[in-house]
Amino acid sequence: MATAMAEDTSFEGDQLASMTTDDIGRASRLLANEIRILKEESQRTNLDLESVKEKIKENQEKIKLNKQLPYLVGNIVEILEMSPEDDAEEDGANIDLDSQRKGKCVVLKTSTRQTIFLPVVGLVDPDTLKPGDLVGVNKDSYLILDTLPSEYDSRVKAMEVDEKPTEDYNDIGGLEKQIQELVEAIVLPMTHKEQFEKLGIRPPKGVLLYGPPGTGKTLMARACAAQTNATFLKLAGPQLVQMFIGDGAKLVRDAFLLAKEKSPCIIFIDEIDAIGTKRFDSEVSGDREVQRTMLELLNQLDGFSSDDRIKVIAATNRADILDPALMRSGRLDRKIEFPHPTEEARGRILQIHSRKMNVNADVNFEELARSTDDFNGAQLKAVCVEAGMLALRRDATEVNHEDFNEGIIQVQAKKKASLNYYA
């Protein structure tokens, strides 16, 4: 309206010269009236602006007051879609505002064991909520003030390896075939997923490493974790055997939930034979609880909630006692055997463990490898340590061939001849 008046009261120079004194006075009064109206509009707008600023400040103070810690912790039970009631209200009748609301409402269960229906969700967008979410609510109004991180068992959080392992495939001797199989099953699906999609195949979900003790199964898993940027969760089989019913299964479930949140993720289960033994009829409650823990593991491996971004590496010394359901395809698809090292592999392992030692040039690793028949990787490392200790005992500056020979004799003396590691 003010623009239209400006157009009406604008005069050209020639037109102004031809106007009489009365016309000019009338035009000036119109302009003065327009200026007065614009000033009144400006004052009214400024007052409205101040009022809105005051309301915003007041609401921010209320939010700040309501968001004071501590919160009451609650769980989202259900999210409902509300539509206003269509019943016609009579004139002058009281109107239930809650029944006229439109949008999402929430059923909430608090830590005080109360179940609350919230027609107004609170300060959190209801579209971002889902059943099972942990939220912080006001202890008086129960309005949702903030979302909280997912709750996991503290024992599961401790399983996450924060520091990246420093091992490399170069630290493993004589297991080139096993390294290739593990890389194909675990590393490539994470680093070159498009190659599998191009071929139209699904990579293995899990890998079972089995063989005698000391042959490098755990070392291989750590080297695999170091080659990927994936989160690494390390579980031990005996860790999952708990006293209370359902506790072990909850640990497995929480471990896979944490892995899904931090995906891509590698879960390494060492000594899986502690929970994965063949099922049998037993009246002992402890045996049944171990079997329930294994059933939860089977469900997580290929159940409805399985995730291809989670890879499982399991290691055991006794693959022969594992349950067939755990070994079938679709769960632990690839089985990689770790045998005792060959003569060539033993020489390579001795070189790896002695590469940082000050070794004399006359040390013949091929001869040492021939002298260490039936030694595993851990025992070959012990030979190198014993050789270094013998050199230290005689105040030598370097380790010679005789020290290694004496180290072999000492490690051999500690071996139990009747011990059968792997049946």
Curated annotation (Swiss-Prot):
Cross-link (Glycyl lysine isopeptide (Lys-Gly) (interchain with G-Cter in ubiquitin)): K234, K278, K415
Protein family: Belongs to the AAA ATPase family.
Localization, UniProt: Cytoplasm; Nucleus
Subunit composition and interactions: Component of the 19S regulatory particle (RP/PA700) base subcomplex of the 26S proteasome. The 26S proteasome is composed of a core protease (CP), known as the 20S proteasome, capped at one or both ends by the 19S regulatory particle (RP/PA700). The RP/PA700 complex is composed of at least 17 different subunits in two subcomplexes, the base and the lid, which form the portions proximal and distal to the 20S proteolytic core, respectively.
Stated name of the protein: 26S proteasome regulatory subunit 6A homolog B
Alphabetic keyword roster: ATP-binding, Cytoplasm, Isopeptide bond, Nucleotide-binding, Nucleus, Phosphoprotein, Proteasome, Ubl conjugation
Binding positions for ATP per the UniProt entry: G211, P212, P213, G214, T215, G216, K217, T218
Transmembrane regions: none
Phosphoserine PTM sites in chain numbering: S18
Gene3D superfamilies per record: 1.10.8.60, Nucleic acid-binding proteins, P-loop containing nucleotide triphosphate hydrolases
GO CC list: cytosol; extracellular region; nucleus; proteasome complex; protein-containing complex
Top-level division of the source organism's lineage: Eukaryota
InterPro entries: 26S_Proteasome_ATPase, AAA+_ATPase, AAA_lid_3, ATPase_AAA_core, ATPase_AAA_CS, NA-bd_OB-fold, P-loop_NTPase, Prot_ATP_ID_OB_2nd
One GO MF term: ATP hydrolysis activity
Role of this protein: The 26S proteasome is involved in the ATP-dependent degradation of ubiquitinated proteins. The regulatory (or ATPase) complex confers ATP dependency and substrate specificity to the 26S complex.
UniProt xrefs under Pfam families: AAA, AAA_lid_3, Prot_ATP_ID_OB_C
Disulfide bond residue pairs: none
Source species of the chain: Arabidopsis thaliana
GO biological process: embryo sac development; glucose mediated signaling pathway; pollen development; proteasomal protein catabolic process; regulation of transcription by RNA polymerase II
